[in-house]
Amino acid sequence: MRAVVQRVNSANVDVNGKIIGKIKKGLLVLLGVGKNDTESDAEYLVNKILNLRIFDDNKGKMNLSLLDIKGDILIVSQFTLYGDCRRGRRPSYSDSASPEKAKKLYEYFVEKIRKEYNIKVETGEFGAYMKVNLENDGPVTLLLDSKKVF
């Protein structure tokens, strides 16, 4: 499972001209599911993302997590995170999970956060064409992979 994690002052996701998810200060997470991913991959990334100390403390040092600041999280599915661009000019998505498997693990990821943590959780719409708007804070952008590829 892969994630692009961005620290934001605000973010929203629009489907067909309607904003369906909106957050203030927190994290925008673009989440991709790989064909070999399991619930343990989702659990690893939930724990990692929510506890990353990437928010400034009162001394300006990145020392606080999303949980510490009681920030919001916007989670958007993005299968293209598994695009392999090493050969040719068109990405191959053969390492992406099937839509059925990806949706199941995406929903598991989202529900784990909703049920176990007291933070605002917003989402995009799985499989839809979306417009994601954000105001980066920093910018701080991190790439995570549950298999620790990078």
From Swiss-Prot:
SUPFAM superfamilies assigned to the protein according to its UniProt record, in alphabetical order: DTD-like (SSF69500)
Which reaction does this chain catalyze? glycyl-tRNA(Ala) + H2O = tRNA(Ala) + glycine + H(+); a D-aminoacyl-tRNA + H2O = a tRNA + a D-alpha-amino acid + H(+)
Q: Is the keyword Acyltransferase in the record?
A: no
Q: Where in the cell is it found?
A: Cytoplasm
GO terms for molecular function, please? D-tyrosyl-tRNA(Tyr) deacylase activity; Gly-tRNA(Ala) deacylase activity; Ser(Gly)-tRNA(Ala) hydrolase activity; tRNA binding
Q: Which UniProt keywords apply?
A: Cytoplasm, Hydrolase, RNA-binding, tRNA-binding
GO BP terms in the entry: D-amino acid catabolic process
Q: What is its EC number?
A: 3.1.1.96
Annotated motif Gly-cisPro motif, important for rejection of L-amino acids, positions: 138-139
**Enzyme class of the recorded protein, top EC level:** hydrolase
An example of a Gene Ontology cellular component annotation for this protein is: cytoplasm
Could you say which protein family the record assigns here?
Belongs to the DTD family.
Domains (record comment): A Gly-cisPro motif from one monomer fits into the active site of the other monomer to allow specific chiral rejection of L-amino acids.
Q: What does this protein do?
A: An aminoacyl-tRNA editing enzyme that deacylates mischarged D-aminoacyl-tRNAs. Also deacylates mischarged glycyl-tRNA(Ala), protecting cells against glycine mischarging by AlaRS. Acts via tRNA-based rather than protein-based catalysis; rejects L-amino acids rather than detecting D-amino acids in the active site. By recycling D-aminoacyl-tRNA to D-amino acids and free tRNA molecules, this enzyme counteracts the toxicity associated with the formation of D-aminoacyl-tRNA entities in vivo and helps enforce protein L-homochirality.
Binding partners and assembly = Homodimer.
**Which protein is depicted?**
D-aminoacyl-tRNA deacylase
What is the native source organism of this protein? Answer: Thermosipho melanesiensis (strain DSM 12029 / CIP 104789 / BI429)
